[in-house]
Amino acid sequence: MPLHDRIVGHFQASAQSKLDAADALAPRIEQGARLLVHSLAQGGKILACGNGGSAADAQHFASEMLNRFEQERPGLAALALTTDTSTLTSIANDYAYDQVFARQVKALGQPGDVLLAISTSGNSANVLQAVAAAHARSMQVIALTGRSGGGLAEQIDDGDVCICVPAESTARIQEIHLLTIHCLCDAVDSLLLGVEE
């Protein structure tokens, strides 16, 4: 296959995956946005975590909340647990890599806060540990995952939200995760700024 056609094929597959997932994910994304707004309105904060590309997504989300998305507004309390290399490496060295997010959640999380837990497979041990720590702190969880949802989907409690991308390709799941993050940011702004309803 010519390289040009291969590239165009990726664009087409990405667009089709997004269209195929839209109706299934929209209610979950709306539910997640309302959960975020409720927490923020009560003085809560959002902690976000993930590995690799999901770590980048966690940072992207936190930056959109702290700064702004597409509307002018005050900054919103959000923190990516993926950015402090001294903290991450000290926890990994002194305890275990699967504790790098959970120990931060235990230290920073408060009842009423929300954890945005991102894992393409749903099986990242450190993300699963973070969810357990969040539940122990009476926090709610928004799980952003794919495929069958893995162990992450199994950890969801009442009041949590699982946004599980119905795709098998890691690239397609990650692309839809980014779109989902943008949808969450837009929905939060719409709810806070009175654009919604």
From Swiss-Prot:
It comes from Thiobacillus denitrificans (strain ATCC 25259 / T1). Its main location: cytoplasm. Its cofactor is Zn(2+). It is found in: Cytoplasm. Substrate binds at N51, G52, G53, E64, N93, D94, S119, T120, S121, S124, Q174. Signal peptide: none annotated. GO terms for molecular function: carbohydrate derivative binding; D-sedoheptulose 7-phosphate isomerase activity; zinc ion binding. The lineage of its organism: Bacteria, Pseudomonadati, Pseudomonadota, Betaproteobacteria, Nitrosomonadales. It comes from the Bacteria. This is Phosphoheptose isomerase. Residues 36-197 form the SIS domain. Pathway: Carbohydrate biosynthesis; D-glycero-D-manno-heptose 7-phosphate biosynthesis; D-glycero-alpha-D-manno-heptose 7-phosphate and D-glycero-beta-D-manno-heptose 7-phosphate from sedoheptulose 7-phosphate: step 1/1. The reaction produces a racemic mixture of D-glycero-alpha-D-manno-heptose 7-phosphate and D-glycero-beta-D-manno-heptose 7-phosphate.
